[in-house]
């Protein structure tokens, strides 16, 4: 089973979604984790749109990447440009992969209403699902 870490800045939205999808789509192929370079808290809208898709991330918490420095990962996936630039060096021989997704909280801040805001989250959720579904090839 491959150990995979999804890394973004806040570990609040995109990396949380990716971890949730990996556990849902590939439970026998991936041991998935997520972390941030500057963690905050899990975004309630991310929890909501993942629940709509049948994935429960309500029990997740935001974690700093340093919590995983003693784990040997097979793959570290950065899901935002900032995390790619500041990816910790201690991941050693882990293969590194970058796939940038737009930031739903940033997109949602100009939304006219909650439904429009959630639309941004749903679109990114679905893009992350498509990406994670193909990750078993790596």
List each model region and its residues.
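Short, charged/polar "capping" segments at the starts of alpha-helices
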Residues: 40-42, 83-86
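Conserved active-site segments centered on acidic
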Residues: 1-67
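Short glycine-rich anion-binding loops that position phosphate/pyrophosphate groups of nucleotides
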Residues: 12, 81-84
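Residues at the C-termini of beta-strands that transition into short coil/loop
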Residues: 36, 80, 100-102
């Amino acid at each position: 089973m491959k150990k995979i870490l999804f890394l973004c800045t806040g570990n609040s939205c995109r990396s949380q979604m990716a971890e949730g999808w990996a556990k849902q789509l590939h439970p026998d192929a991936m041991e998935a984790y997520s972390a941030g370079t500057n963690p905050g808290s899990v975004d309630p809208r991310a929890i909501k749109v993942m629940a709509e898709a049948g994935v429960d991330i309500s029990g997740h918490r935001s974690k700093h990447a340093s919590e995983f420095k003693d784990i040997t990962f097979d793959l570290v996936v950065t899901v935002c440009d900032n995390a790619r630039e500041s990816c910790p060096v201690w991941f050693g021989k882990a293969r590194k992969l970058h796939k940038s997704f737009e930031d739903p909280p940033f997109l949602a801040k100009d939304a006219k209403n909650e439904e429009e805001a959630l639309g941004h989250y749903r679109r990114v959720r679905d893009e992350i699902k498509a990406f994670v579904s193909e990750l078993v090839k790596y």
